[in-house]
């Protein structure tokens, strides 16, 4: 019997949703950073086994929005819960169930798919705190399963995969065996550049940036020539992004090029232009140009 289905991964910002997706896939498709609210779009990735096919939706973290981009991210995450076959709800060890987790649980009550509670980052907590957290969440919702894991250390993730197959319905193979994502290459390129910016910039700047791929061409020798706009909200941020003697921008470019060459399996030449677009996160038309469609 072949099983298949759509699986959404939900949770508060920075609980490890993208790390888990990347671990299960064995490919780096979702942007990973230690800063919250890193994922902005629902990334659809496909994992095919001998008797199953899972289509993952890696959502932005659900949080209280502060601008139109935040509204997009929350709408995108809550919409992903609807019409799926299985939900993975990620959280981390805690002393009490917080407001963010309770808000997600309320959204889960409106759908019929089974929900597996995944307690991530257990390697960073004591066994007593892990047990207490599982008990706390068991009182909040009737989960189909509850499982502690460490996505970073790949602890207990094989067991999680078995549980996911268990709860998948019988179904067809939606995508070819060798297809691992439905997003375009240009989107992944933009996400890689944004990840490197996130890792190299200070606290205030990162979430005020966006990346727009202006050009992506492959020459006769197979080398990619890529030009991107790195968009920020303030002129002062532009100076921070460029850095003294251009060093910060050079570091973003060099680390992005290395990752892009791994992803594209080809040589890459990348040029990054820093542009200021004041309050772009509250500009609906610009947000849509940048690919954020789910604004209400």
Curated annotation (Swiss-Prot):
InterPro entries: G_ERA_dom (IPR030388), GTP-bd (IPR006073), GTPase_Era-like (IPR005662), KH_dom-like_a/b (IPR015946), KH_dom_type_2 (IPR004044), KH_sf_prok-type (IPR009019), P-loop_NTPase (IPR027417), Small_GTP-bd (IPR005225). It holds the Pfam family KH_2. It is a peripheral membrane protein. GO terms for biological process: ribosomal small subunit assembly. It is found in: Cytoplasm; Cell membrane. Residues 201-278 form the KH type-2 domain. Residues 3-170 form the Era-type G domain. One of its GO terms (cellular component) is cytosol. Residues 58-61 are annotated as: G3. Residues 120-123 are annotated as: G4. CDD domains: Era, KH-II_Era. GO terms for molecular function: GTP binding; GTPase activity; ribosomal small subunit binding; small ribosomal subunit rRNA binding. It comes from the Bacteria. This is GTPase Era. It comes from Clostridium perfringens (strain SM101 / Type A). The lineage of its organism: Bacteria, Bacillati, Bacillota, Clostridia, Eubacteriales.
């Amino acid at each position: 019997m072949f099983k298949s289905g759509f699986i959404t991964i939900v949770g508060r910002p920075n609980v490890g949703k993208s790390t888990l997706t990347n671990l299960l896939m064995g490919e780096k498709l979702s942007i990973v950073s230690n800063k919250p609210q890193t994922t902005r779009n629902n990334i659809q990735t496909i994992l095919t086994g001998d008797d199953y096919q899972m289509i993952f939706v890696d959502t932005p973290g659900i949080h209280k929005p502060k601008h139109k981009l935040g509204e997009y991210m929350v709408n995108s995450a809550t919409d992903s819960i609807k019409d799926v076959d299985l939900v993975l709800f990620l959280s981390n060890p805690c002393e009490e169930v917080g407001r963010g987790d309770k808000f997600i649980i309320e959204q889960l009550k409106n759908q019929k798919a089974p929900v597996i509670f995944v307690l991530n980052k257990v390697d960073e907590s004591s066994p007593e705190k892990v047990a207490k957290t599982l008990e706390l969440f068991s009182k909040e919702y009737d989960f189909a399963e509850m499982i502690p894991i460490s996505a970073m250390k790949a602890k207990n993730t094989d067991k999680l995969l078995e549980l996911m197959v268990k709860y998948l319905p019988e179904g067809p193979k939606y995508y070819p065996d060798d297809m691992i994502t439905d997003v375009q290459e240009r989107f992944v390129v933009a996400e890689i550049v944004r990840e490197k910016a996130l890792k190299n910039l200070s606290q205030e700047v990162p979430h005020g940036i966006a990346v727009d791929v202006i050009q992506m061409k492959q020459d006769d020798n197979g080398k990619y020539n890529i030009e991107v706009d790195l968009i920020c909200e303030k002129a002062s941020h532009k100076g921070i992004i460029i850095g003294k003697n251009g060093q910060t921008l050079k570091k973003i470019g060099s680390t992005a090029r290395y990752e892009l060459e791994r992803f594209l399996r080809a040589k890459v030449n990348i040029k990054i232009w820093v542009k200021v677009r004041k309050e772009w996160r509250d500009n609906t038309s610009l947000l849509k140009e940048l690919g954020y469609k789910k604004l209400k």
